[in-house]
């Protein structure tokens, strides 16, 4: 008897669904551009009638392009299909605007690392501004505690926001680690990590 090998499924890096289901989501243009850049050999099989977005344009369609597609969809012969297409295009436009706003908010934010003197020769560092970048403070504190062999905890500051407090003067190493975390997220390479 022969054993069956499990089927290998590739998941989208944008919407995290299997590639065949991306067309039903609101981030289809971004999913297509991701697939074309990461798996160009799969793009022609999943989207056979669609031109490669890398050859057409590198970014997702703008709001004006989506509006023109919306007008074309309303001119369709089937009213139900036109209505569904119009709703999908509206959701795509809203989703794209929301993503752009979040990205600009993240790019304008900064992470502050403060070095505070505890005793004459002992210091702690306080890291604040992590909530915008979706970095969980508890996981970061645990990582710092194991990485630097020091005590680390999460406390609320005066503004009722979480900040990570690490014992010892490890501000340079913490800055490097946080910059590495931000470079892993798309579009956040230029975010400032400021020691003070």
UniProtKB/Swiss-Prot annotation:
All copies of domain SUI1, residue ranges: 111-182
Keywords, ordered alphabetically: Cytoplasm, Ribonucleoprotein, Ribosomal protein
GO biological process, any: translation reinitiation
PROSITE patterns hit by this protein: SUI1
Source superkingdom: Eukaryota
One Gene Ontology molecular-function label: translation initiation factor activity
Location, primary (coarse class): cytoplasm
Family matches, as PANTHER family: DENSITY-REGULATED PROTEIN (PTHR12789:SF0), DENSITY-REGULATED PROTEIN HOMOLOG (PTHR12789)
Domain comment (free text): The SUI1 domain may be involved in RNA binding.
Protein name listed in UniProt: Translation machinery-associated protein 22
Source species: Lodderomyces elongisporus (strain ATCC 11503 / CBS 2605 / JCM 1781 / NBRC 1676 / NRRL YB-4239)
